[in-house]
């Protein structure tokens, strides 16, 4: 059990402590809250919508993996379906800092990989850094997205990022989280490669055309996938490995359980994720084999 979940329960509002315990300690809890669960918590707590989301932030931050900074950040996004998705910052000891994932990126990619096509709002412990503001500006819902911080009035993303630069400035009309199927195929039948290819076909890479996907197989048999999330400003792009690692951590698993990995990408893309994927996985465990396929 995640001990920080237990600590979050201890400090949760008394009126919803029992209900929250039933939800977050359930064996099938996947770091999400359904619209019905959130409505029940609203009714039981007597809190306003934004107040409840802020009260839930410690549960999102409980998923933080921060061996470098010991700085735990949580984020909660609400998908267009009404489901709430937790996210938290992720750091990789031994890898360069550019491999770090911010809490906002974590929650957004969590929602994306679970099928959401946009988010309506995001709630965060701390004011989003410029990197994350730019990352969020790539979203399908960037123009309407609302940002909620503790003890602050809700503001729009565009208020946090005035005169913003985004996909439209580069002639791109499809934002991150657009439902896509690039329909690439391969004759390779290895399950972990097939899973990585499925992630590739969902990826957002309009600038380099390097559609790519990663899959991670655990010793217990579970497989987690990540699709590449490219950004108009380039540097805030989120590699497919990091997206997969986020899904793994939010499902309650550890890096030590990774047994195999696969990266599939487009051969004619103008960049490659191979070197960074290999070096980052080597920082986690140099014995993880990586299957690579360029199609």
Curated annotation (Swiss-Prot):
GO terms for biological process: cytidine deamination. The active site is at 104 (proton donor). It comes from the Bacteria. Keywords: Hydrolase, Metal-binding, Zinc. This enzyme scavenges exogenous and endogenous cytidine and 2'-deoxycytidine for UMP synthesis. Homodimer. This is Cytidine deaminase. The gene is cdd.
């Amino acid at each position: 059990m995640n001990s920080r979940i237990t600590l979050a329960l201890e400090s949760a509002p008394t009126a919803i402590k029992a209900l929250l315990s039933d939800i977050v300690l359930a064996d099938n809890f996947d770091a999400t809250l359904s619209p019905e669960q959130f409505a029940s918590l609203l009714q039981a707590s007597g809190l306003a919508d934004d107040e409840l989301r802020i009260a839930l932030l410690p549960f999102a931050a409980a998923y933080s993996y921060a061996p470098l900074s010991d700085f735990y950040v949580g984020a909660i996004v609400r998908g267009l379906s009404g489901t709430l998705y937790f996210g938290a910052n992720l750091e990789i000891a031994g890898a360069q800092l550019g491999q770090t994932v911010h809490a906002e990126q974590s929650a957004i990619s969590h929602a994306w990989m679970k099928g959401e096509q946009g988010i309506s709002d995001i709630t965060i412990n701390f004011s989003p850094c410029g990197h994350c503001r730019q990352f969020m500006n790539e979203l399908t819902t960037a123009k309407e997205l609302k940002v909620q911080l503790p003890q602050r009035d809700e503001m729009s993303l565009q208020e946090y990022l005035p005169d913003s630069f985004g996909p439209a400035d580069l002639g791109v009309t499809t934002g991150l989280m657009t439902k896509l199927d690039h329909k690439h195929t391969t004759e390779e039948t290895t399950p972990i490669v097939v899973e990585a290819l499925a992630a590739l076909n969902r990826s957002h890479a309009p600038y380099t055309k390097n559609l790519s996907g990663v899959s991670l197989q655990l010793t217990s048999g579970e497989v987690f996938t990540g699709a590449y999330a490219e950004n108009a400003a380039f540097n805030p792009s989120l590699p497919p490995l990091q997206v997969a690692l986020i899904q793994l951590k939010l499902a309650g698993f550890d890096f030590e359980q990774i047994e195999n990995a696969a990266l599939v990408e487009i051969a004619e893309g103008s960049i490659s994720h191979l070197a960074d994927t290999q070096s980052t996985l080597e920082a986690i465990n140099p014995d993880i084999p990586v299957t690579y396929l360029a199609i």
